[in-house]
Amino acid sequence: LFLLPSAQTRDKTSVNPSQMVKMISHLKDQFDYVILDCPAGIEQGFQNAIAGADRALVVTTPEVSAIRDADRIIGLLEANEIHKIDLIINRIRHDMVKRGDMMSSEDVVDILSLPLIGLVPDDENVVIATNQGEPLVGSNTLAGKAYQNICYRVLGREVPFMDLEKGISFWARVSGIFHKS
């Protein structure tokens, strides 16, 4: 695994899409997978990142504004002839879904009409690991297991989706029974 971070310059036009296509083509000759993390939004950084892509993983949260943005991104990907698009739903909170305060993964999939490749629960361990510079993949956390499962699915393995309700403690579930509206 090699990681090449993006440049942190103010000038996002220092590399154009044709240069990205050339660079990605060169990298594809050397690696099995070349994964580009797109910046949020649809500006030049996004256009550069998708220039050489043959597949996309759209990551969204189950919030109305995020789903609208994801839908816009999907349209742009399709307009740029990227048709292998999968969906990752991030920061899911089963307790909020049960209360009706958050869309379910099924609702998000219905709205965006993409195959689901990953469900990542909201997990404070993500913040802790990020701040400590530690990876979560391979860790004994719900999010770490979810990331590992996404990796397996990208590789073509059939892996069942985790039951996110199991990640909620017994007392939280009991409490939820008595706090229904």
Residue ranges and their predicted role:
Residues 18, 22, 26-29, 33-128:
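Conserved catalytic-core segment of NTP-binding enzymes
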Residues 132-181:
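NTP-binding/hydrolysis catalytic cores, primarily Walker-type P-loop NTPases
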Residues 1-29, 128-132, 136-137:
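P-loop/Walker-type NTP enzyme "switch/lid" segment
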Residues 15, 68, 103, 138, ...:
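Conserved active-site and cofactor/substrate-binding residues in soluble primary-metabolism enzymes
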